Regions:
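Short loop->beta-strand "edge-of-pocket" segments that line small-molecule binding or catalytic clefts
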Residues: 55-70
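Ligand-binding clefts/hinges and TM-proximal coupling segments of bilobed small-molecule sensing domains
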Residues: 70-87, 125-129, 156-177
């Protein structure tokens, strides 16, 4: 995640589409977004069979998040209220292994990404019901206004696949929705 942002800001990449949630804060800091292509929220997952059933069970424990992510912001917003600490990781697979291995009690991540990983890899985790926040749209992001043509082409292509039904087919195939 951080490497993608740095590459774009350094001009080594023209844009990124790695689950970049469209937020006012990101827009204010110079991100330029396409139209939203998927609404996603963040939620909490625990090791399969864990006694943790909600945020209130995290008191005195540590949770994992990806550095500089929406899930990190979400967990940080809950930490004081529920008495847990936040531990930062650079990628989801390492974070998930920390949950399964017991180094942390839970993790926060984008719900569709986490659900897909659990399903596809069989990793011993489960998403805790009732822990999701309000969804935000993912967008294709650029950091240089000279690349506006990329955003325009992306938006046109997105509109086309939504209009002809291809978008719905992709979502159904890969996300089961």
């Amino acid at each position: 995640w951080d490497a993608s942002i740095a590459a774009c800001q350094a001009g080594q990449a023209d844009g990124m589409i790695a689950g970049a949630s469209i937020t006012d804060g990101r827009k204010e800091s110079g991100w330029i977004f396409s139209d939203g292509y998927y609404d996603a929220n963040q939620s909490m997952a625990v090791a399969t069979g864990s006694d943790i059933k909600g945020f209130e069970d995290l008191n005195g424990k540590s949770v994992a998040v990806k550095t500089a992510s929406m899930s990190a912001t979400y967990a940080e917003s809950l930490a004081d209220q529920y008495g847990f600490t936040v531990t930062y990781f650079e990628d989801s697979p390492t974070m998930y292994q920390a949950v399964v291995g017991g180094q942390v009690a839970a993790c926060f991540d984008d719900t569709p990404i986490m659900a897909s990983n659990i399903k596809d890899t069989g990793i011993g985790m489960e998403i805790v019901d009732g822990t999701g926040n309000d969804p935000a749209a993912y967008g294709f992001a650029i950091f240089n206004a000279d690349n506006q043509e990329l955003i325009d082409m992306f938006n046109k292509g997105l509109a086309n696949i939504k209009a002809n039904g291809t978008y719905d087919e992709i979502i159904a195939k890969y996300l089961g929705e």
